[in-house]
A protein has these predicted regions:
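Oxidoreductase cofactor-interface core, primarily capturing Rossmann-like NAD(P)-dependent enzymes
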Residues: 1-92
């Protein structure tokens, strides 16, 4: 996995330097659970946290990110949380 993470880091940096608009979403461990509609999103979430999130919540975040201007040219970690998706993205 270390090789994957290094390649991912380099790809993310290349995208950031490209001049293109981007949003990089880094979800935690993906679960086969129903969505809650509530997340935690931050530039960095410590590894000692419960880093799980449902696939459905990740999909919701990806769709909302298409129209939420506050996430343009940002990268963020994403896990299950207590904040509604729209609010969490606005607060990044």
């Amino acid at each position: 996995m270390e090789i994957y993470y290094e390649a991912k880091r380099k790809a993310d940096e290349h995208l950031k330097q490209s001049g293109l608009s981007y949003t990089i979403v880094r979800p935690g461990a993906l679960l086969h659970e129903e969505k809650t509609g509530k997340i935690e999103a931050a530039a960095h979430i410590p590894d000692d946290r419960d880093i799980e999130i449902s696939r459905e919540d990740v999909a919701t975040v990806l769709v909302e990110s298409l129209t939420e201007s506050n996430v343009k040219n940002k990268a963020f970690d994403l896990i299950k949380g207590d904040t509604p998706v729209e609010e969490a993205l606005r607060n990044l």
